[in-house]
Amino acid sequence: YCQEFLWTCDEERKCCGDMVCRLWCKKRL
């Protein structure tokens, strides 16, 4: 299961797709 856009994330909880984790999931520019 992955973290959606703007959900909090960490090493254990990865973001969905190719979003990057910066404390929360952000879309790649």
Curated annotation (Swiss-Prot):
Domain of life: Eukaryota
GO molecular function, one term: sodium channel regulator activity
Keyword Ribosomal protein tagged: no
UniProt entry tagged with the keyword Disulfide bond: yes
Signal peptide: none
Tissue expression from the record: Expressed by the venom gland.
SUPFAM superfamilies, sorted: omega toxin-like
Disulfide bonds: C2-C16, C9-C21, C15-C25
Major subcellular site: secreted
Gene Ontology cellular-component terms listed: extracellular region
Cell compartments where the protein resides: Secreted
Residue numbers carrying Leucine amide: L29
Keywords on record: Amidation, Disulfide bond, Ion channel impairing toxin, Knottin, Neurotoxin, Potassium channel impairing toxin, Secreted, Toxin, Voltage-gated potassium channel impairing toxin, Voltage-gated sodium channel impairing toxin
Domains as described in the record: The presence of a 'disulfide through disulfide knot' structurally defines this protein as a knottin.
Record family assignment: Belongs to the neurotoxin 30 (phrixotoxin) family.
Note: Negative results: has no effect on human and rat Nav1.8/SCN10A.
Purpose: Spider venom neurotoxin that blocks voltage-gated sodium channel Nav1.3/SCN3A in human (IC(50)=1 uM) and rat (IC(50)=1 uM). Partially inhibits human Kv11.1/KCNH2/ERG (40% at 10 uM).
Protein's name according to its UniProt entry: Beta/kappa-theraphotoxin-Pmu2a
Source species of the chain: Pterinochilus murinus
